[in-house]
Regions:
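N-terminal catalytic or cofactor-binding beta/alpha core of small enzyme domains
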Residues: 2-181, 186-255, 261-303
Length: 303
């Protein structure tokens, strides 16, 4: 599935049910002739189409460290297995689809935010809706941003992504009575704990401690990954953020699960290039996608 980039804001239809908003997102529906499943995968952080008004002062190669690079390539087989697939084209460093639109870092504003600010651990770290910092303490901008600048990003990028994902989920609930949403991310090979570098597992699944999806779905995905030989953690160190919190309502048949994959399995983090492990991981992800679709179809078929 080819990467698509552009700067126009006009909608372009690809094939029936598919949508391309240049520079913003691409939506893929199940391939023709494939049994559809009540499943949607989304990749909000793999975009690399940097807008012309992104007035950053750090080099592009530094900004790219914020990307979940190639995650969209890992999950591009979803439509062929019967699932919907949505990916952002804009970069996470420009505006983060996995943050609430009021999750604002007030330190980077030239004027007060017009609504109550949602203060979170991430926003206080400079990693809110609009990133202030990259690589720990490196400032992305050399000036404060205006409310108008941020609102333009929200209206042109953040809200369209949410609207498209919501429509995909709603359509499946209307058809099947339930939907299984998989929010796809990648994580650094190591994390920090008490000042020490700690190797991370192959996968981390997040369901916000059982609040965003039925624990049985989380356990199913964890078991499938372990069967393939991968190490898996659940809700540690990532339990999921805004997207699965917003859309995961398991009591209403709306199940949202976040999946983080260790970048060391498939890419060189310094060069931001795929390595020889990409193919093997892609085959595992394809198998996982098929098993998730079969799981979901089995759930809606139960009396």
């Amino acid at each position: 599935m080819a990467r698509i980039a552009g700067t126009e804001l006009a909608q372009v239809n690809l094939t029936q049910g598919n949508t391309h908003l240049p520079g913003i997102l691409v939506r893929y529906e199940p391939a023709q002739g494939v049994q559809p499943a009540p499943v949607v995968f989304d990749s909000p952080h793999s975009g690399y189409d940097y807008p012309g008004d992104f007035d950053h002062v750090v080099p592009r190669e530094v900004l790219r460290r914020a990307e979940d690079a190639f995650v969209d390539d890992l999950y591009e087989g979803a439509p062929g297995a019967g699932a919907g697939f949505l990916k952002a084209l804009f970069p996470r460093a420009y505006i983060d689809p996995n943050r609430h639109e009021d999750e604002i870092d007030s330190d980077m504003l030239s004027e007060p935010w017009p609504r109550p600010v949602r203060v979170t651990e991430k926003s206080e770290m400079g990693l809110g809706l609009i990133r202030r910092l990259i690589k720990g303490r490196v400032h992305i901008y050399d000036r404060p941003l205006t409310v108008g600048e941020i609102m333009a990003r929200i209206e042109s990028y953040h809200r369209p992504y949410y609207a498209e994902l919501e429509s995909m989920l709603d359509a499946r609930v209307a058809t099947y009575g339930a939907v299984w949403h998989v929010n796809c991310h990648s994580m650094r090979t190591t994390g920090r704990q008490q000042g020490k570098s700690i190797p991370r597992d192959d996968f981390v699944l997040g369901d916000r401690e059982g609040e965003s999806c039925d624990p049985g779905f989380t356990e199913f995905v964890a078991a499938r990954l372990k069967d393939m030989g991968y190490s898996v953690q659940i809700n540690h160190p990532f339990k999921g953020a805004e997207l699965i919190e917003r859309f995961g309502r398991p009591l209403e048949g709306r199940h949202s699960l976040q999946i983080e994959v260790n970048r060391g399995l498939y890419m060189d983090e310094d060069r931001i290039e795929k390595h020889d492990g990409f193919g093997e991981l892609k085959r595992s992800i394809d198998r996982l996608i098929a098993e998730i679709c079969a799981f979901a179809n089995g759930q809606i078929a139960r009396p």
